[in-house]
Amino acid sequence: MVVKKVKRKISLNIHITTLIITLLIFIVGVFIGVQIASQTTSQIQKQLNQMEENNYNLQLLTLINTSSYPSTVLCETLEKGVESFEQQTFNMGSNLQFLESKYGSNDPSVTSLKIEYSTLEARDFLLLQKINEECGNPFFTVGYFYSNENCSSCGEQGDYLTAFRRQHSNVMVYSFDMDLKNQSFEIALLSSLYNVSSTPTIIANGKVLTGLQNVQQLNSYYS
Amino acid sequence: MLEEVVTILMYVIAFLTLYITIFYLLLTIEKKDEIKEKAAGVYTPPITVIIPCYNEEGVITKTVSVLMKSDYPKKNLKVFLVDDGSTDNTFQEMKTLEKKYKGNVKAFSKKNGGKSSAINYGIMRARTELIATLDSDSYVHVKSLKKMTSFFKDSTVMAATSAIKVYKPKKIIEKVQHVEYLLTIVSRRLLSFLDSVTVTPGPLSVFRRSVFKKVGLFDETSLLEDQEIAYRIQAHNYKIVSSLNASVWTEVPRTFKALIRQRVRWNRGGLRNYWKYKKILSPRYGDFGVIIFPLGLIGSIAVLAVFFISLVSLLNGSAFQFFQYGFKVFYYGFNALQVISLIIFTLSVLWIWVASKHLKEKMNPISIALYLVFYSFLITIFWIVTIGEELSFRKQRW
């Protein structure tokens, strides 16, 4: 008995329709994804702008002549301002760190946000030195110069600083990415002001400490 | 560099998954009238149902009793019980059944040689136009045999597959398999429209006896003999059809360990069958050669790729971002890949909804949710164990 065999064919119509729909959905999906991502950066940009404004307000306060205004009231206001600003800075740092891990450190929008953030931190760091002078050193300031590219102990140093910051409520830590030195005037200024040439380098209340510093060592400078 | 390769790979996998989901959805919509089987008229030629058995004491009586309640004309129904060298009382039980259903049931005993050898033993002794293979733990619906044989009115049909369902699913693991089996019924029916049925399942399939003369008997060395024979029939360009309504209930693994053992056997057998029939990967085999046949292999590779990417992200810590960054992982971390994954998930749910319209049995929404959430994890586990066993060259039996 001769058995008829199956006539094989490719269902072109359905494949072409599938391909068109798939491409359309794929493009729309990518578009929506990119939109969401750009909204994320613009949202963070807004937060940064708000922080810049706060920083500017604090700067204005330091211009007030202490002789014509009770210094304790002024210092209390400044200290409160600095504490809330430090919390915002810390959150923003964590947001940017997340974005960096998500989109990569070479992503242009992440880099631009980071430069803006570092600039703000540098300004805040300088402002704090002034407040310390005016108000009798209420804060222990730490400037931390790190690098993502040429520093094997920077991760560890970051962990030590986080632990150190947790131990003392008046410790204010500001991190500066030395890889952005050429793009940020403020980082370049600070690094030349303190003669920073390697990473990690820590400026603990004005004292320059080069190389890895553990929590115990940091504590010895705190007292 | 590695990061870019992984990203591109993820997008390729997402694109292929999206393509397949839409392909199935469109096919289901296009064939919505054909999916429902129209009565092709009664066709009940002589048929031999072969039941291979190995240590099935206490099970085989139920299987045969249920089969003998079938509305198939008894004068045309032969049942061959082939004992594959059982070490328990299976053969004695078979002899009792032979006496009880004299003229219809015949018991055979042979030396142990594996499931395929037991089926082949039966095929070589059968003289009927049609031959059915039935697992010893599967229960045939009273009308199923008639429904399946009606396909053979068309002289081009060489094999027909049944609608396999889980027998009384109670435990969660059985309920999840219940959803899987029901969805497979619809997808196999759809595949038959593309001449792309990839398996003539052991629980119940019917063959025209002449097909074995054309393509040969079951491969006694195969770990997955019901897929091997289907690939061989396809490789010879013969027609396999699939039924939506010819129900057969089968026992499924009730423990996680047993399920892993079953699926690892399927995977290992499947890999060997792919290699054996790699020539099918060609436009000469139409839709079967360019999409359905490669789909299984690509799907498995994709599962493993996603697993290794997840493993890498687990090791480099990015999978723990939630603990480091909290909820911002979700609202700041949403990207294009996640949008596409969400679309694929939604379309899959849509397909399940469309497919379920064609099934008489209702699916429990909780079981569907469990199936959707856990099945990809389970498939990954099955493949990891498969690789482990392949690398350790462990032998496997039926």
Over which residues does each language-model region extend?
Chain A
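Non-globular targeting/processing and membrane-anchoring segments
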Residues: 1-140
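Short, intrinsically disordered low-complexity segments
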Residues: 183-199
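Coiled-coil termination/hinge junctions
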Residues: 132-146, 153-156
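Sec-exported extracytoplasmic/periplasmic mature domains
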Residues: 125, 166-169, 223
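Typically the conserved alpha-helix immediately C-terminal to a functionally engaged Cys/Sec
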Residues: 152-167
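Thiol-/selenol-based redox modules, centered on thioredoxin-like
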Residues: 214-223
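Thiol-based oxidoreductase modules, predominantly thioredoxin-like and allied folds used
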Residues: 143-147, 169-185
